[in-house]
Amino acid sequence: MMILGKAGILAQYGTIYVRQNTIRNNLSSCIFKQSLCAFHSLAKVLQQKQVPLDLSYDIIKRDAVKTGDEGKPRPPIIILHGLFGNKLNNRSIGRNLNKKLGRDVYLLDLRNHGSSPHSSVHNYEVMSEDVKHFITKHELNTNGGPIIIGHSMGGKVAMMLVLKNPQLCSMLVCIENAPVSLRPNAEFVEYIKALMEIVNDKGKTIRTLKQADEHLAERIGGNELVRRFLLTALKKVKMDNSSSVSSYTFEERIPLATLKDAIVKGEIAAWPLDPARERWTRPALFIRATQSHYVVDEYLPIIGAFFPRFETRDIDAGHWVNAEKPGECAESIVDFVERHED
């Protein structure tokens, strides 16, 4: 009886012990899960709230004596390039504007392009924050704020910047883009695939710029201007085992996989803002290329909803109008600025 009793008591104690352990384990598991959830929430917040990057840039300084404005600098101009581009693409239009408007012109490399830092995050929110950081850091938000100009992807960055920060800039010029969401551009994905093939060849069959250009021509077509532009996304590296001065292997200058991912996910084609919440009432110019389809007439009411003081200028060129006809682009911008500047 006593043994049975002791066994019963032990069994009861054992049950209590097991239950206590179960409670402890469940509590530990709960605490762990809560900690894990908190960690993921924090990671998500940190991912959403990216630290702005310090962007690479060139500056074309104004000649204060020639322009007659010593001690009274006019609002500067900031120019943003498009996808696959860099600050060098806008040198010609930048020099034109510098000469005709007599002010400093800043040519920026956006994140994951040119000489600017790389990041796994590539969307308009973070890119516009990078540019805002640049303006603030260089104290350009004086005298009414800079004139912001952007082509294609850079145009959406510029639009996002002024809509989110209405007092930051004095004027907007958007070249070949509109505040609309589109389907991801499959053509851009093919561009990246062709460039990655050149990189992955590692000098086996593609050893010169001519051979790289021929590969692009075979893969994406015959537009020489586009091919030349795309090849700036690669850098030549002299082959160690080659006696020929013109034999190279090619490496990525920009993170092609990151940009491909952003294109496929729709980050480049996206437009997340709503004119019911964001509007910009300062002067805005939209330059359209007549041989392109980026800013069709159907988009004009949407542009007007975001930018009620907008106007358009059409130029007979393709999508890369700023490179094809920099002089005509500059003339349109000069006319716009001179009419709207105080």
From Swiss-Prot:
Keywords: Hydrolase, Mitochondrion, Transferase, Transit peptide
EC number from the UniProt entry: 2.3.1.-
Protein name: Probable alcohol acetyltransferase
Transit peptide interval: 1-38
Propeptide feature ranges: 39-46
Mod. after translation: Processed by both the mitochondrial processing peptidase (MPP) and the mitochondrial octapeptidyl aminopeptidase (OCT1).
BP GO terms, sorted: lipid metabolic process
Function: Probable alcohol acetyltransferase that uses acetyl-CoA to synthesize acetate esters from various alcohols. Not involved in the synthesis of ethyl acetate.
Domain AB hydrolase-1 intervals: 75-326
